From Swiss-Prot:
The gene is pnp. Mg(2+) binds at residues 567, 573. This is Polyribonucleotide nucleotidyltransferase. NCBIfam families: polynuc_phos (TIGR03591), pppGpp_PNP (TIGR02696), PRK11824.1 (NF008805). The keyword ATP-binding does not apply. The keyword Nucleotidyltransferase applies. It is found in: Cytoplasm. Its cofactor is Mg(2+).
Length: 775
């Protein structure tokens, strides 16, 4: 047995450098490298990547640290043989949130982690989207990337660190991948010292809360710079490395959104997150991405992993592609001019079958290749017509939006509903309101433990005319719901202004391009129909891009309101949501090595013009909150002294339960004395308010007042009757039974009986004497 010290600073001397020096620990056999994130006035953060100690049997493993206390393990493994019958790359990304990372025990019945939560699923998607394109095409071995969050500083967010950890472990796995991916979260901080705002990388939770706008940006280097291989030794010396440039950083993914206080901050003079500001943020992320990619390159060069041989399965051979092109290109060109999606899909499917039948004799046992080549020819036809003629599948111009159809108040008993149609994309929005007691409780590693605005997105198989599984949401549905929620959340009124929990459901009833942005539009309409006073209406649009050489010149054509086929065959999926004044959410995925800044700026400008057109169409139907539905709960807010909260609740909730039983209203009390009263009618709410005020602000009853009370206790000398909350009086036995003498109180009244009484006397100690009221 060998006893080894485990203090981190004893094993790796704590120094930081931008030169990507690799540290090697001979005792433990570990390599590590640091990337320093310099935020100027806001300090610096350090990302450390280490390999060689944990999970040694995985193809590649890396432990990533953010500063000292945030730590996660990423492993990349691959199956030994390719999966038969697969025509796609089977990559799986999983994020495991361990509650011990935050020093907590899971709140589930079994006290162990179960299914991944929403935060973990969204982190999986953030990793998958930029990582998947780095694998060589034609790979069919199963690849699994698992990121396990082991320690989390409460001030940090782990998801972007996980992107870098997953990329680093994949770089060391020996799998056929291109260069590393770097991911960074950028927050636009505006304060007294930075009135124009400064973009801060890897912001803390505190900075996140005070930010105006935030984005996650992932990218890679287009020309790899490989540092020297380090010499062995306990500590590696500093060495110079090529100066990082940002013009060699290709942006692969952007996920962005405004914060909840953006409207108030902009009204107070802060810069609005307009298209130009967002573009500046993307550019500001590039130096940090270069730094992170450089660190991963240095680590890979130091470890020098053995690259394994993996069989590749190209989708088709050149001979098959040439034959399909000759056989079917003319027919495909005609088919791709059909505007109706269903008719076009049926014709294309039929032509694919005809092409297979025509070529199968020439290429026996290569049917899958023929079909894949048919898809490739279809893609080439669509792209070339857009580039050469600006001609789209459905005949629109490149900046045209499909026909819009807007309707509200469709679902009879829903609190709010809408139908938004953009071409063949059809979204039903449904809003439900309830008390703040119905806030979603979140058991995750983050500090957020509840959600007041909840957005759910459903994508049933019939929306594309297909059959499939229904039930629990898939990762895509969770991701689309999160995007729509991020777009709308900054416009949701505060708890004080609108004390309701809001659940918004987006039902994708028909899909042909950007159901997520359709969900944003439908949700704005539905929320207005439900009476929710949004700070401003929000709309969204999906943009696309097709690039290629035309007459020897590189040409970029930006498409507004893309179809599903244009998304699949294009180079970019760019979703932009916002108000009339600024962007509230943005999502970008691209297949290119980089989008020129002027092309990106043009796409943002084009998206704004489309957004304004959609907002105008929506405003023609509804432009302000409707009266609330008769079926929605009415919530009244009052305040009681904090010292009276216990009295209002009563022993074991006796008083508050009695108020609910008597009035039909639901009552919830906050720690600051705010009381929320929910009722289906105004009368019930008023009755509950009166009962609460009687307890919290009691007034002494007067002699001669009459009450319909409840007998709460009987004794040998009389009956105690409750006339007000926490206020009882005694009816002496001599006053019961009229003029007749009775032996037992129970011969006349019992506990629970209603009895009309009058106050006969109140002594100097406040004790109340009652007498029954004769009919």
């Amino acid at each position: 047995m060998i006893a080894r010290g485990t203090h981190r600073e004893g094993r790796i001397p704590p120094f930081m450098t931008n030169n990507h020096s690799v540290f090697y620990d001979e005792e433990f056999g570990t390599h590590s490298v640091e990337a320093t994130i310099d935020n100027g006035d806001f300090g610096s953060r350090t990302i450390r990547l280490e390999t060689g100690q944990l999970a040694r049997q995985a193809n590649g493993s890396v432990v990533a640290y953010l500063d000292e206390d945030t730590m996660m393990l990423s492993t990349t493994t691959a199956s030994s043989k390719p999966r038969e019958g697969f025509d796609f790359f089977p990559l799986t990304v999983d994020v495991e949130e361990r509650m011990y990372a935050a020093g907590r025990i899971p709140g589930s019945f079994f006290r162990r982690e179960g299914r991944p939560g929403t935060d973990a699923i969204l982190a999986c998607r953030l990793i998958d989207r930029p990582l998947r394109p780095t694998f060589v095409k034609g790979l069919r071995n199963e690849v699994q990337v698992i990121v396990t969050v082991m320690s989390l500083d409460p001030k940090d967010m782990y998801d972007v660190v996980a992107i870098n950890a997953a990329s680093a472990s994949t770089q060391l796995s020996g799998l056929p991948v291109s260069g590393p991916v770097g991911g960074v979260r950028m927050a636009l901080i505006v304060d007294d010292d930075h009135e124009d705002g400064q973009w801060v990388a890897f912001p803390t939770r505190e900075q996140h809360e005070s930010a105006l706008f935030e984005m996650v940006v992932a990218g890679r280097l287009t020309d790899e710079q490989v540092p020297e291989k380090p010499r062995k030794g306990r500590r590696r010396g500093r060495k110079s490395s090529p100066r990082k440039k940002t013009d060699n950083v290709a942006i692969m993914m952007v996920e962005a959104g405004a914060t909840e206080t953006v409207v108030e901050r902009v009204n107070d003079g802060a810069p609005a997150p307009t298209e130009s500001v967002v573009a500046e943020g993307i550019e500001a992320a590039k130096p940090f991405i270069a730094e992170l990619c450089g660190a991963q390159q240095a680590l890979r060069q130091a470890v020098d992993p053995e690259t394994e041989e993996f069989p590749l399965f190209p989708p088709y051979g050149a001979d098959v592609l040439a034959a399909v092109d000759s056989e079917a290109k003319g027919r495909i060109s005609d088919i791709m001019s059909i505007a109706d999606k269903q008719e076009r899909d049926e014709a294309l499917s039929s032509d694919m079958d005809d092409t297979v039948e025509a070529l199968l004799e020439e290429f026996p046992e290569r049917e899958a290749e023929i079909r894949a080549a048919h898809n490739a020819v279809t893609k080439e036809v669509v792209r070339s017509r857009i580039l050469a003629d600006g001609f789209r599948i459905d005949g629109r111009g490149v900046e045209d939006i499909r026909d819009l159809d807007v309707e509200v108040d469709l679902v009879p008993r829903a609190h709010g509903s809408s139908l938004f149609q953009r071409g063949e994309t059809q979204i039903l929005g449904v809003t439900t309101l309830d008390t703040l007691k119905m806030e979603q409780q979140v058991d995750s590693l983050g500090p957020v433990d509840h959600r007041r605005y909840i957005h759910h997105y459903n994508f049933p198989p019939y929306s594309t005319g297909e059959t499939g599984r229904v039930g629990s949401p898939k990762r895509r549905e969770i991701g689309h719901g999160a995007l729509a929620e991020r777009a709308l959340k900054p416009m949701i009124p505060s708890r004080d202004d609108f004390p309701y929990t809001i659940r918004q459901v987006s039902e994708a009833l028909g899909s042909n391009g950007s159901t997520s942005m359709g969900s944003v539009c439908a949700s704005t309409l539905s929320l207005y129909n439900a009476g929710v006073p949004l700070k401003a209406p929000v709309a969204g649009i999906a943009m696309g891009l097709v690039s290629g050489e035309v007459k020897g010149k590189m040409t970029y054509v930006t498409l507004t309101d893309i179809l599903g086929a244009e998304d699949a065959f294009g180079d970019m999926d760019f979703k932009v949501a916002g108000t009339e004044d600024f962007i509230t959410a943005l999502q970008l995925d691209t297949k290119l090595d980089g989008i020129p800044s002027d092309v990106l700026a043009g796409a943002l400008k084009q998206a704004r013009e489309a957004r304004l057109e959609i907002l105008n169409t929506m405003a023609e139907v509804i432009d302000e909150p409707d009266p609330m539905s008769d079926y929605a709960p009415r919530i009244t807010t009052i305040s009681v002294p904090v010292s009276k909260i216990g009295e209002v609740i009563g022993p074991k909730g006796k008083n508050i339960n009695q108020i609910t039983e008597d009035t039909g209203a639901r009552v919830s009390i906050e720690d600051d004395g705010t009381v929320f009263i929910s009722a289906t009618s105004g009368g019930s709410a008023e009755a509950a308010v009166d009962r609460i005020n009687e307890i919290a602000n009691p007034q002494l009853p007067k002699v001669g007042e009459r009450f319909l009370g409840t007998v709460v206790k009987t004794t040998a000398f009389g009956a105690f009757v409750s006339i007000l909350p926490n206020r009882d009086g005694l009816v002496h036995i001599s006053k019961l039974g009229g003029k007749k003498r009775i032996e037992k109180v129970e011969d006349v009244v019992n506990v629970g009986d209603k009895l009309e009484v009058e106050i006969a006397d109140i002594d100097n100690r406040g004790k109340i004497s009652l007498v029954p009221v004769d009919d």
